[in-house]
A protein has these predicted regions:
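Glycosyltransferase-associated regions of secretory-pathway enzymes
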Residues: 1-95, 113-270
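Small-residue hinge/turn detector
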Residues: 96-108
Length: 270
């Protein structure tokens, strides 16, 4: 359901300091965020693909967070982060950071609103790791669109409640707050955090292949038609969810989008 204002109690939240996490796998909770409970047609139809696959009969709970509910979660359970959260110079920084508090407090799966769910995520959730995925396929060599460093996108993340890496991310928000969006809270921030975590010799973060969670790059035409997702599932047999890259910053970059379709995951097998 939609959380319009007050979020439900969060057993895993830290108020006066981090609490020991559950030794458990990722719970079946789907988190998504929108400015209000009133979704546009595009977002509503894509969200429905995910709530249909991940339903109550399968033990799932789908939460739609509003801006108001996100701020209330931070105010209530993460008061030490509230000043940074309120002080962001870009609302998208709040949107990006809110998903970290959701995952720390409740655990589960975070997906951007422009994802379609082609298959159940149940198989990948049998893990105690923090899960992320590559934003580009390993074969990507385009000099402009594929940086030398491999991007880990923050449009999909999954974690057990109170995972240590989620705490690590939250603790890094203050130091990065004044940076540009990409590196303050976005994919650059997440990529750097994964690198820093691993450089310290820590484990518990797993990076899934691009085709598993994204299925198409933002700067190429999507190979699937949104009105025929059954066909899309057949075209992308190794893909669990796929992003149609409908976010506002991606729309601004539409002029840079190439006309050819992304075929990197067509027929790919897990």
């Amino acid at each position: 359901g939609c959380i319009a204002d007050a979020p439900p109690p969060a057993a895993g939240a830290f108020i006066e300091g981090p609490r020991r996490r559950d030794n458990s796998t990722i719970p079946r909770i789907l988190h998504q965020t929108f400015k209000s409970c009133e979704l546009r047609a595009d977002e509503a139809s894509l969200r429905e693909t995910c709530t249909r696959v991940h339903n109550q009969e399968e033990g799932w709970r789908a939460l739609l967070w509003t801006d108001t509910a996100n701020r209330e979660l931070v105010r209530r359970d993460y008061a030490a982060s509230l000043r940074v959260y309120n002080g962001y110079d870009d609302h998208m920084k709040r949107v990006d950071s809110a998903r970290l508090f959701q995952l720390h407090a409740y655990g589960g799966v975070y997906l951007d609103m422009d994802f379609a769910c082609l298959r159940s995520l149940n198989a990948v959730l049998q893990s105690s790791d923090f899960l992320v995925a590559q934003q580009h396929p390993s074969s990507c060599t385009h000099r402009f669109y594929c940086p030398k460093w491999s991007i880990i996108a923050n449009a999909f993340m999954a974690a057990p409640r109170a995972h240590p890496f989620t705490e690590f991310l939250i603790q890094r928000l203050r130091a990065s707050a004044k940076k540009r969006l990409l590196h303050a809270t976005g994919p650059g921030f997440l990529t750097a955090a994964v690198q820093a975590w691993r450089a310290r010799g820590y484990s518990g973060v797993r990076v899934l292949p691009f085709c598993t969670m994204y299925g198409a790059r933002w700067y190429l035409q999507h190979p699937c038609n949104r009105s025929s997702l059954d066909a899309c599932a057949r075209q992308l047999p190794a893909t669990l969810t796929t992003s149609f890259w409908l976010g506002s910053w991606k729309k601004k970059a539409a002029s840079e989008k190439l006309s050819r379709p992304d075929v990197s995951c067509l027929g790919a097998h897990a």
